[in-house]
């Protein structure tokens, strides 16, 4: 078994870590940064950019630059959350055949797991460049409050990217692993995780290598992106009041505004006020317009007050479900970039009545925890037991459209529960099992995560046949459901892939596409490297030909020029092998020129040496004036 990497697949940024010599190490990407923007862009010439490269060109290519795709993963197009995103997204969100939310870029539709896979491939490449070996195994983190569909979609993304996902682990749980690995004393901690797109709160008990999650709660549509949006709306409204132009109608201006608002938000974590300056943001008949606005920390807090208020209830529910009061919590751990905001820290202090612990890096701690979990699975990290929970209740629809829960929320996983049901009508030949996830009493108010039928039930009065329904949640928090007719022994089972998730055929196709794209990327890299080397050779040959061409015969000179022209023509093409061959041909043809240059250099050195010896031989000779004396005149 090779190295197991830990990946924090974030809404705004992603991070990768690995265990090295018993210690987790965060790996910097090719640009030298320890986190990578979770962005994918498609350029006009068909190139795909991921990470920092995608972010750099977002302003000039807003419609084809995808960000915060994690907010769409495992979601229906018709859901309220997606509807809200459609209003503000510069790229096009469309309805897939299965009802999911997909994106349409340059006339091609992509599923969120496919886009996430591109980000995962970038993280995989980062790890491989650092380790110098191929990586196939990974532990990937998800928000604790992700439902079954979202977890399955994340696992699909891993598969599409060419990774073998050993475990899906909750982000707060990963953070607790990073925090408590070396702690021996027993303590109760709250992990407050507010990232770019999601909010989680988990209550855990740590002690002697056991990490037990007592409860979890959260909001999968609350994070830094929402704070940015509130600031953008405020700034756009102020600009409209002043200039009469709504920047929200201009996608390019909106992308510039988004970046400026995000920067201002970050700056206000350390300073009391900042300026948002965007020259030439737009124009009308009177000429160009500039945006210049001063934003104070107190104004930012009032703009985002409704979002800050949303942080309270999940914390209260998590404490209640864990059977604890705020005073029972020993430490509150801050995770996610948004927890750097002073107002968020003040809200945490208000909820828990204590100063939060800022001892971990909020951007890296989740990836570090994932790497530690990878070490646990590989056997590198000993004496660690992780007991996670399922965030939402699971059950089936029964007579009267009621949801009958088989597994309650905050049940430790893996777990298995069975219950016996019967038919609702006489001589009923089949039972439809409608699998639900959520906390509401009525089936229609909860999320459908799968349906299947158990057929072939022998005719009998209602209430007589006995059908055993079994729910089995694995360590990834992914559900497997089976139904068995105890009378005939007939069984029907499904692994819940979400009622609208990707089919195995679709995943296989996406895996092939990703592999093809990977080989395309490799070929592009080969071409670029071959061109770069050829360009260097062509430049030095041309320079030498200009300076020393007169020292070789005309035939040799013509041969070199022909080989040079052939190489330049090859560099225009896309065949790296052809470029390499033409480079070798030019190198061979240039041998005589190189000899002439070498000979001249040697002759020059010899001449300089002789001149040096001559001057050295004259050393000790003193020039003196002299006067002839006429002896006779004495």
Swiss-Prot record:
Any Pfam family: HSP70
Ranges annotated as biased composition (Acidic residues): 620-634
Residues with PTM Phosphothreonine: 198
InterPro entries attached to this UniProt entry: ATPase_NBD (IPR043129), Chaperone_DnaK (IPR012725), Heat_shock_70_CS (IPR018181), HSP70_C_sf (IPR029048), HSP70_peptide-bd_sf (IPR029047), Hsp_70_fam (IPR013126)
Induction info: By stress conditions e.g. heat shock.
Region described as Disordered: 599-634
Gene3D superfamilies given in the database record: 1.20.1270.10, 3.30.420.40, Actin, Chain A, domain 4, Substrate Binding Domain Of DNAk, Chain A, domain 1
GO MF terms held by the record: ATP binding; ATP-dependent protein folding chaperone; unfolded protein binding
Biased composition (Low complexity): 602-619
SUPFAM superfamilies reported for this sequence: Actin-like ATPase domain (SSF53067), Heat shock protein 70kD (HSP70), C-terminal subdomain (SSF100934), Heat shock protein 70kD (HSP70), peptide-binding domain (SSF100920)
Role summary: Acts as a chaperone.
PANTHER family, alphabetized: HEAT SHOCK PROTEIN 70KDA (PTHR19375)
Similarity comment text for this entry: Belongs to the heat shock protein 70 family.
Name of the protein: Chaperone protein DnaK
UniProt organism field: Syntrophotalea carbinolica (strain DSM 2380 / NBRC 103641 / GraBd1) (Pelobacter carbinolicus)
The gene coding this protein: dnaK
């Amino acid at each position: 078994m090779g190295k197991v990497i830990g990946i924090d697949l974030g809404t705004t940024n992603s991070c990768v870590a690995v265990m090295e010599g018993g210690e987790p190490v965060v790996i910097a990407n090719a640009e030298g940064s320890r986190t990578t923007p979770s962005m994918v862009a498609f350029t006009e010439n068909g190139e795909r950019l991921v990470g920092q490269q995608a972010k750099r060109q977002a302003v000039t290519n807003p419609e084809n630059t995808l960000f915060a795709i994690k907010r769409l993963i495992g979601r229906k197009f018709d859901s309220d959350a997606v509807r809200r995103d459609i209003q503000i997204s510069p790229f096009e969100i469309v309805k897939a055949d299965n009802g999911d939310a997909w994106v349409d870029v340059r006339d091609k539709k992509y599923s969120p797991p496919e886009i996430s896979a591109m980000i995962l491939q970038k993280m995989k490449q980062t790890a491989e460049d650092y380790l110098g070996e191929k990586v196939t195994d990974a532990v990937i983190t998800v928000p604790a409050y992700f439902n079954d569909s979202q977890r399955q979609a994340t696992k699909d993304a891993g598969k599409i990217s060419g990774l073998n996902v050993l475990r899906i682990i909750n982000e707060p749980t990963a953070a607790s692993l990073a925090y408590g690995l070396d702690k021996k004393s027993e303590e109760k901690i709250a992990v407050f995780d507010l990232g770019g797109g999601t909010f989680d709160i988990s209550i855990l008990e740590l002690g002697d290598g056991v990490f037990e999650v007592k409860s979890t709660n959260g909001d999968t549509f609350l994070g830094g992106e929402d704070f940015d949006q509130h600031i953008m709306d405020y700034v756009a409204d102020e600009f409209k009041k002043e200039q009469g132009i709504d920047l929200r109608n201009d996608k390019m201006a909106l992308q510039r505004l988004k970046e400026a608002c995000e920067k201002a938000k970050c700056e206000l974590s350390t300073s009391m006020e900042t300026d948002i300056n965007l020259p030439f943001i737009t124009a009308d008949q009177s000429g160009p317009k500039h945006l210049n606005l001063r934003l104070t920390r107190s104004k930012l807090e009032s703009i985002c007050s409704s979002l800050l208020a949303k942080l309270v209830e999940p914390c209260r529910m998590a404490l209640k479900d864990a059977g604890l009061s705020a005073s029972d919590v020993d430490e509150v751990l801050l995770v996610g970039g948004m927890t750097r905001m002073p107002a968020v820290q003040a809200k945490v202090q208000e909820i828990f009545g204590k100063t939060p612990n800022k001892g971990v890096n909020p951007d890296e701690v989740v990836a570090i925890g994932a790497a530690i979990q990878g070490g646990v699975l590989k056997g590198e990290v000993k004496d660690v037991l992780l007991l996670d929970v399922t965030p939402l209740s699971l059950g089936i629809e029964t007579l009267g459209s009621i949801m009958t829960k088989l597994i309650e929320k905050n049940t430790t996983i893996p777990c298995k529960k069975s219950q016996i049901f019967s038919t609702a009508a006489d001589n009923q030949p089949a039972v439809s099992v409608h699998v639900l996830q959520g906390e509401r009493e009525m089936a229609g108010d909860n999320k459908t995560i799968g349906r299947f039928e158990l057929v072939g039930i022998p005719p009998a009065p209602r209430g007589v046949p006995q059908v055993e329904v079994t729910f089995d949640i694995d360590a990834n928090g992914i559900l497997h459901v089976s139904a068995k007719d105890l009378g005939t022994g007939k069984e029907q089972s499904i692994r819940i892939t979400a009622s609208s998730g990707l089919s195995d055929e679709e995943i296989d196709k996406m895996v092939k596409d990703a592999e093809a794209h990977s080989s395309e990327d490799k070929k592009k890299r080969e071409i670029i490297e071959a061109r770069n080397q050829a360009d260097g050779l062509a430049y030095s040959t041309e320079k030498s030909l200009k300076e020393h061409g007169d020292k070789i015969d005309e035939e040799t000179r013509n041969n070199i020029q022909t080989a040079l022209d052939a190489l330049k023509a090859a560099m225009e093409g896309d065949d790296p092998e052809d470029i390499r061959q033409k480079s070798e041909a030019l190198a061979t043809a240039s041998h005589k020129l190189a000899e002439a240059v070498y000979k001249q250099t040697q002759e020059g050195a010899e001449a300089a040496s002789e001149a040096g010896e001559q001057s050295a031989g004259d050393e000790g000779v003193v020039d003196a004036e002299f006067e002839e004396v006429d002896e006779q005149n004495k």
